[in-house]
A protein has these predicted regions:
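Transmembrane alpha-helices and adjacent helix-loop boundaries
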Residues: 1-315
Length: 315
């Protein structure tokens, strides 16, 4: 137990150190912007990892919750005069309620049936956002009001770097603590075998729903943060391709690994920036690198590297 607690705080200290040191190495607004995008994406991926990596449930429509959070901070101030900080809370609450209502029937499904059902939810959210142009701006998107906290207008890539970095550290801390709670252990039991979990007295339906709601909350908050940071939002953030990106981050980094979700997000966000020098071959190389990574690191980047490091240490 003490070893797990020490490992948990070691991860948090290492993450906080990375967030603190990066501006000293890359002190420019461009790198602040890219890093902020990594932090937001990693935050969303950590939530999805709770659902997929810990509870063993598939979601191909999770960008729907991301879009709800994003559009909440756009629609709230623009149409109802709600302060952006309150719109974040409203968007998160709405996402959690929807996750509960949608999750009750669809989480009775398994495997590819569940994947298709969650995909349908994501498509429905994206469709509503695109067609309800009076509220959302339609396919063209809409501007997002600036976040104001205690009379301070939040702006600038460096400011958002620290806000999103702090958000990621907080989200990581919550996810790591969840692992050692009865809820976290129930999630892992579900992942291993629903039948065995049910025999052990675990309320399978309730814990599936809890994982779905937690993942929705993470995605919604991440969506709100990205919308406020960009000052603009469009339906792509709630689309299927974004859902696939989120799943790829979790799987690439390592299912069940909180650190893996962060690494997966960092790789998937920064690689396209690095590969831009190859111009028209950029997407080809990106796909090739991901395929090779999954062939040689089937469990994901972090679990594979951890296993190799453990073998070397034992030797």
């Amino acid at each position: 137990m003490l070893q797990r607690i020490g490992h948990r705080y070691l991860i948090l200290i290492a993450l906080a150190a990375v967030v603190a040191v990066l501006p000293l190495i890359f002190p420019s607004s461009y790198y602040f912007r890219v890093a902020s995008l990594v932090w937001v994406s990693a935050f969303a991926a950590i939530g999805l990892n709770v659902l997929m990596g810990q509870a063993g449930q598939v979601s191909l429509g999770h960008a729907g919750f991301f879009g709800i959070g994003a559009y909440a901070v756009a629609i709230g101030p623009a149409h109802f005069g709600v302060p952006p900080w309150a719109a974040i809370i409203i968007g998160c609450a709405l996402s959690c309620v929807l996750a509960y209502l949608v999750g009750r029937p669809i989480l009775k499904l398994k495997g590819h049936y569940l994947a298709i059902a969650t995909l349908g939810f994501g498509v429905l959210v994206a469709l509503v956002i695109t067609t309800e142009s009076r509220w959302t701006g339609g396919p063209d998107g809409m501007p997002v009001a600036k976040l104001v906290l205690f009379g301070w207008r939040v702006s600038g890539s460096d400011t958002w770097y620290w806000i999103t970095g702090g958000l990621l550290v907080l989200g990581t801390w919550l996810a790591l603590n969840l692992n050692d709670t009865p809820t976290g252990r129930a999630f892992r039991a579900l992942h291993d075998s629903e039948v065995a979990a049910r025999v052990a007295g675990i309320d399978v339906a309730r814990f599936k729903l809890q994982a779905f709601v937690i993942a929705a909350a993470y995605a919604s908050i991440a969506g709100s943060a990205l919308a406020l940071m960009n000052g603009f939002i469009n339906p792509d953030q709630a689309g299927f391709l974004h859902s696939v990106e989120m799943v790829t981050m979790v799987v690439l980094g390592g299912l069940g690994s909180v650190v893996g979700s962060i690494v997966g997000a960092a790789v998937l966000i920064t690689l396209p920036q690095i590969l831009t020098v190859f111009q028209e071959y950029e997407h080809l190389l990106l796909g090739f690198i991901i395929i090779v990574s999954m062939i040689f690191m089937r469990d994901g980047i972090v679990p594979t590297l951890s296993r190799l490091l453990a073998k070397r240490t034992q030797a």
